[in-house]
């Protein structure tokens, strides 16, 4: 889950991307972040020299003894991370999710897993990190949602539902046949039949992760809104997950297509 990036709606936003391979990552960094720029490096290029600490919230620090790490617990350990010399905390998925794929199956882009805390807890973490000269970025899963997301539940309810075109549907499995199956150990096709919708839906990853339709302007704009929401909260940037697969075209691998790069630019 994987590559390339979007420059968010923030001043002096910048993008860095790794080679277009299945395990590559990408960061969209908001250049106007309040954290200082160590060593006098240009603000927009801070990430090229930063020490990143990749962090799974549930495995880090538990503030209420329920056996699950949470944002208050993480915030209480910021002095330790500062002492380690961390420049930027990279948060693995924490949005609301049924957790069938470690949080990469999001059911609410604007929410936080209840066991981790609240949106206000995330805001407090970011503010306290900035006060210590550290930045915070988060994983942003753009290619697909959980099949439990209200968008998909609406989409499958009726061909006439406004959300129907937020996902990729077909009456046949014979579309985009040149696109490889990524999880060949669990998936036999990139298409899965939905009984309620009476149609196949497209997914490049697990069958419970339907792909969003980036040919739909409403989807493109809503995902920008999601990015803006977290930037407004104080996030300094994102690792954009699985972005090589945003667009599908017949006769291609449907990976790293020109339309994808144009959207992310």
Description of each model-found segment:
Residues 2-224, 228, 232, 243-265:
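Acidic/aromatic-lined carbohydrate-recognition and catalytic surfaces
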Residues 236:
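Receiver (REC) domain switch/active-site residues of two-component response regulators
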């Amino acid at each position: 889950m994987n590559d390339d990036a979007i420059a968010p709606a923030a001043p002096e936003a910048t993008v860095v991307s790794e080679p277009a391979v299945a395990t590559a990552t990408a960061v969209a960094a908001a250049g106007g972040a309040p954290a200082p720029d160590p060593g006098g490096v240009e603000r927009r290029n801070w990430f090229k020299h930063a020490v990143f600490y990749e962090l799974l919230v549930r495995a880090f620090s538990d503030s209420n003894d329920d056996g699950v790490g949470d944002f208050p617990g993480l915030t209480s350990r910021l002095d330790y991370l500062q002492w380690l010399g961390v420049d930027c905390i990279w948060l693995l998925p924490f949005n609301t999710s049924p957790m069938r794929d470690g949080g990469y199956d999001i059911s609410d882009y604007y929410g936080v897993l209840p066991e981790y805390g609240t949106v206000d807890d995330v805001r407090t973490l970011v503010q306290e990190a900035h006060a210590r000269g550290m930045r915070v970025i988060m994983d942003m899963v753009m290619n697909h949602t959980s099949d439990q997301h209200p968008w998909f539940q609406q989409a499958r309810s009726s061909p006439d539902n406004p959300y129907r075109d937020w996902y990729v549907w077909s009456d046949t499995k014979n579309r985009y046949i040149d696109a490889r199956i990524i999880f060949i150990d669990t998936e036999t096709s990139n298409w899965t039949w939905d009984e309620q919708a009476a149609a196949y839906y497209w997914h490049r990853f697990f069958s419970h992760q339907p792909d969003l339709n980036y040919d739909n302007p409403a989807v493109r704009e809503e995902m920008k809104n999601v990015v803006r929401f977290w930037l407004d909260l104080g996030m300094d940037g994102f690792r954009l997950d699985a972005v090589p697969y945003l667009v599908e075209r017949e006769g291609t691998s449907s990976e790293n297509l020109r339309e994808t790069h144009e959207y992310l630019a």
